[in-house]
From Swiss-Prot:
Binding site for ATP: S9, F10, H17, G93, L94, R95, E103, V128, R129, T130, I131, T132, A133, T134
Binding site for substrate: S9, K41, V78, R92
One cellular component (GO) term of this entry: cytoplasm
Gene Ontology biological-process annotations: coenzyme A biosynthetic process
Record-given protein name: Phosphopantetheine adenylyltransferase
Main subcellular location of this protein, as a coarse class: cytoplasm
Record lineage: Bacteria, Pseudomonadati, Pseudomonadota, Alphaproteobacteria, Hyphomicrobiales
InterPro entries found in the cross-reference section: Cyt_trans-like, PPAT, Rossmann-like_a/b/a_fold
Pfam family, one: CTP_transf_like
Subunit structure: Homohexamer.
Name of encoding gene: coaD
Cited function: Reversibly transfers an adenylyl group from ATP to 4'-phosphopantetheine, yielding dephospho-CoA (dPCoA) and pyrophosphate.
Keywords: ATP-binding, Coenzyme A biosynthesis, Cytoplasm, Magnesium, Nucleotide-binding, Nucleotidyltransferase, Transferase
Site residues by UniProt (Transition state stabilizer): H17
Length: 164
């Protein structure tokens, strides 16, 4: 059984993240979405909220394949989380050349520390290439329409966060 790990902050999960998750499910039997927890960062959504939003979004977008997705938290190195959960693949999404430069450096470092873990790059679909969670949060905070950029459950949660 092939297990992939897909790490990020997912604050919030976007249509771009879901595009990468769909691609990862074509490569692996199971995909672990690993939410990085950083003590110095104050996310908009709690870990529990992000787990729920990833779950709801997966059910809505992936259908029966949502059962092949699990969500964990990790602090420290993603390679340690990958080893703990017996992942063989680390999935990374690429939006542009800037992402590629950074991700190649990370893949090189991770490959040195964990040669058994293969990094796989998935290019973003052009329709979601410009989406970032940071921009989504900014647009939502200013009352803009974020529906084109995030799953429906996330749009509702963002609207609730910024109306209170």
């Amino acid at each position: 059984m092939t297990i992939a790990i897909y790490a990020g902050s997912f604050d919030p999960v976007t249509n771009g993240h879901m595009d990468v998750l769909k691609g990862a499910l074509r490569l692996a039997d199971e995909v672990i979405v690993a939410i990085g927890v950083h003590p110095g960062k104050k996310p908009l959504f709690t870990f529990e909220e992000r787990v729920a939003l990833i779950g709801e979004s997966s059910k809505a977008i992936l259908g029966k394949d949502a059962g092949r997705v699990s969500v964990i938290s990790f602090d420290g190195l993603v390679i340690d989380a990958a080893r703990k959960h017996a992942a063989q693949l680390m999935v990374r999404g690429l939006r542009d050349g800037t992402d590629l430069d950074y991700e190649m450096q990370m893949a090189g470092m991770n490959g040195t520390m964990a040669p058994e873990l293969q990094t796989v790059f998935l290019p973003a679909d052009p329709a979601v290439r410009t989406i970032t969670a940071t921009l989504v949060r900014q647009i939502a905070s200013m009352g803009g329409d974020i529906k084109p950029f995030v799953p429906a459950a996330v749009a509702a949660a963002l609207n609730t966060k910024f109306k209170s």
